[in-house]
Amino acid sequence: MNRNDIIITYGSDAAKMTKALLDAIDIESMVPDKKASIALKPNLVVAVTADSGATTHPEIVVAIIEYLQGKGYKNIKIVESAWVGDSTKEGFRVNGYNQISKTHQVPLVDVKDDTYEKKTIGKITMEVSTTILSTDFLINLPVLKGHCQTAMTCALKNMKGCLSDRSKRMFHTLGLHNPIASLNAVRCADLVIVDSLNGDLDFEEGGNPVRTNRMFAARDSVLCDSFGASLMGFELEDIPYIQLAESLGVGSSDLSQANIIQLNEPNDEKPAKPTGAASYLGAHTRPDSACSACYGNLIHALKRLDEVNRLKDIKVPICIGQGYKGMNDPNKVGVGSCTRGLGKSLGGCPPKAIDMIAFLKELND
């Protein structure tokens, strides 16, 4: 796997998808020493299960452990810290990590109980987990989801779980963006495998999951987050820590130089009906046998339009899904390759939310 590769797979079987990504990554070429220490860093920000859209699916963690152990790697740890005020141990319990640890003989490291090393980048000094700093190969397992303060969280921000609680508080005092970039300049992931199966629409605690049935992998955390932002309909300027991390040499945000490798096509599993805060967005759509990946991107695009008071400009429902294949109707508007016969249509399988936003804005400008 090259530094500019982004490998994507679609489906609903997290374990199978993870194995497909690992096969494509060729992890043995990245970690030739079978005695290397490997840390898995999921997102367990709060003690809720993955169906909430907040936390990493444990099936992904299990699949990685089994894959690595099958290749002869034995020195594996799961390392995480819940946010300030919540219990990592409860997050481990709720999501079955205690049993995972026992079954696979993989230690759980609660960063809240770890020792720390002070690291300084610029004028920002932080306390970083000794376990994370000493590991030979760090696999970051973030959830791509919305965030109430930084708009989005993925690879770069998930590293905040490697800090002491004191440093987490300090990060919020400093406004998050500069500290997040600085943290990744101290230690960023060697490999990122993103859980983008059903991340929350706009809140890191979950509660409004949007099913997209997608996972992707990258070596460059900055490129990973740049791609994730485009999937959720954000411009880079909306998430300052991405370009701040780039300026510190963490990686590149230039998606034009990314090598996108799609392992399979999105499946035709019917997407879940939006609930909660996302339900009003679904009222602007007309799905017919839509794939979750495509429909989820549309929901994110509509959310971005709503945030800038442009949702009201959409006068006709947006068609989406395989049910529109072969249909020719000059009066309808659609997104995705399946709607190419409609009067106005955006191609792509699936199109990214950022492209949907531009298309929908152009309709009404």
Model-inferred region functions:
Residues 1-365:
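N-terminal and secondary-structure boundary signal
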